[in-house]
Amino acid sequence: MDKNPQKTKRVAVYIDGSNLYYKLKDLDIKNITYFWYGNLAKQLAGEGRTIVAKRYYIGSVRAKGGDKKAKKMQEGQVRLFNHLQSKSEGFNVQRGYLMKNDGTYHEKGVDVKIAVDLLVGAYENMYDTAILISSDTDLIPAIQKIKHLGKEIEYVGFSHKPSYGLIKNATETRLLTKNDIKEFENIEKEKKN
């Protein structure tokens, strides 16, 4: 019998959907709706760690009246939510909202939801390590508290637009390139649509 069994590390993955969307778009990744988010999470967790939670945060579009742009965005979000919540992806989707101001949409409430969930997870000992895919520096106070509680936080960003504030405050940093994420682009789904 093994006298020193090594405990499997528990990992929770938190994705800032809007932040990731624009980073993938910058890299010319196609068909972002059907990107293999679950496989990306699996790769980031790596061997010897167990994913205990996968959360995807996004501002929800509310189409009002004859707003055709909002209606089209809403239809795209429904497809995205269905994909994320499918058995193969297994994400818990957390919604903020989008506010339209002067014709431009602004996401509201998402960073607060991420910060609260990170902190609740740390306080309730739900994970050993949080993997955060976001470049939002508003999350730094939550990150600092998580570290103070003895948890690890891995910042996953992109080499073309890293967040130096998150790099400085995270326990570990991984900056992805287009080559790192190309394998998660769902080309087959793109051909069907």
In which residue ranges do the predicted regions lie?
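Domain-level signal for Mg2+-assisted phosphodiester chemistry and nucleotide/NA-binding surfaces
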Residues: M1-H106, E152
